[in-house]
Structures are given as structure tokens and as C-alpha cells.
A protein has these predicted regions:
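Conserved catalytic alpha/beta core of Sir2/sirtuin-type deacylases, generalized to analogous enzyme cores
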Residues: 1-215
Length: 215
């Protein structure tokens, strides 16, 4: 390769020459894809929580000690939906997949937003070590099981007044103020032991590593 080649040129050539590629991906890749956790996107969905509780980004809100489970799940249902069930605003993951098409590849990621799967990467070549926004687990694990949450999260959002579009967009009818709590009957409980459930995210030693995690 010519000495004056750019880093992008060298990367392109390295990818072309490689028989196999290992991809390591963290939060920066999803940020590049438009999953901003602060600023306008945060204000669009969480301005009411910001005003009441004083945190200024989604990540900080995820650790806030909400006074009730009803409020906690109102917050988390919005958080989960826009970062897991809505498509990324920019096609960064699709572009990455095109770069490695036809090659052997393996992905190791700490991201929990399911973007690799939504971009049609082979799940068998993917290890997402920190969990998935789309899964729930027992808060005091009585078993190593996780449970898909799309249906219950949708119900939580609709109970707050949101309308979910065919493209998974969230909107509120004119004159409606979103509620900041869900009905108590929508709080998820473990089907095995009855304890409250939580997200399947690695934040402490209660993280459940289910069968899919170990494959």
C-alpha cells in the first residue's frame, strides 16, 4: 500500500485481506448510530422525570431510587422501548455488516440494545456479555431464566398514555400528559417464585446468565 494512504484506506485493505474478523463493540458504536442518552432525545421522552427528580440523562435515571415500583417501571418501560424496540436512527450497524459480509466473523459486545441482531448479524457469531434490554429476570434470582419483555413493556407504555406506531414510534395524543406511573397490576413478577422482576443487565452479582448466554 502507498505510504500516503489514510487510516481508512489501511483499514479497508486489512478487511479485504482478512480471512476472519473479530469485532469488539461498546457504547460508542450505538452512540454513533444515534442512540444518544442525553440531550434532545432524553428531553423528548423523559422531561417529566427530569423535572421531578433532577437527573439529566437516561443512564443516571436508570440508577435513581424511585419511591415506587410503579414509577420505576414507567421510567424503565420508556427507556427499554426507545433503546431496544425502536430502530437505530442511523445505519451504522447495517454498514458494519456489509463490511464483513462473506467473511468469517465473531462479535464480542458489551452493548445491550440488540442492534447487532436487528442489523441481521448471525446470532451464533455474537456474544453480548452484559445482558439485553429486551429481557427480564428475577430480582433475586431463583433460577437462571430470562423472559422476553416486549408485550409487558408495550402495555406499560399504553397505560401511561403513549400510542405506539407501526414503526415503533412513541407519541402522545394532543392534550394528553403522560402518566409517570404504571398500574400496580402491570408490575412484573417472577413466574417461578413471585418476587419482583428486574432487567437482565449486568450491574451486580445477581445478573442471570441464561442458557443463551452460555451458548
Amino acid at each position: 500500500m502507498k505510504s500516503g494512504s489514510t487510516p481508512v484506506d489501511r483499514l479497508r485493505q486489512a478487511l479485504s485481506d482478512a480471512d476472519a474478523v473479530v469485532i469488539g463493540a461498546g457504547a460508542g458504536l450505538s452512540t454513533a448510530a444515534g442512540y444518544a442518552y442525553s440531550g434532545e432525545r432524553f428531553a423528548r421522552y423523559f422531561s417529566d422525570f427530569e423535572k421531578k427528580y433532577g437527573f439529566h440523562d437516561m443512564y443516571s435515571g436508570g440508577f435513581y431510587p424511585f419511591p415506587t415500583e410503579e414509577e420505576r417501571w414507567a421510567y424503565w418501560s420508556r427507556y427499554i422501548w426507545i433503546n431496544r424496540y425502536q430502530n437505530a436512527p442511523k445505519p451504522v450497524y447495517d454498514d458494519l455488516r456489509k463490511l464483513v459480509e462473506g467473511k468469517g466473523y465473531f462479535i464480542l459486545t458489551t452493548n445491550v440494545d440488540h442492534c447487532f441482531q436487528k442489523a441481521a448479524f448471525d446470532k451464533k457469531r455474537l456474544f453480548y456479555t452484559q445482558g439485553d434490554y429486551g429481557l427480564l429476570q428475577c430480582s433475586q434470582p431463583c433460577c437462571q431464566e430470562t423472559y422476553e419483555n416486549e408485550v409487558i413493556v408495550r402495555q406499560m407504555l399504553e397505560s401511561q398514555g403513549y400510542v405506539i406506531g407501526e414503526d415503533s414510534s412513541l407519541s402522545v395524543p394532543e392534550g394528553v400528559t403522560p402518566k409517570m406511573a404504571i398500574p400496580s397490576e402491570l408490575i412484573p413478577h417472577c413466574p417461578v417464585c413471585g418476587r419482583p422482576m428486574t432487567m437482565n443487565l449486568r450491574c451486580d452479582d445477581t445478573f442471570v446468565e441464561d442458557e443463551g448466554w452460555h451458548r
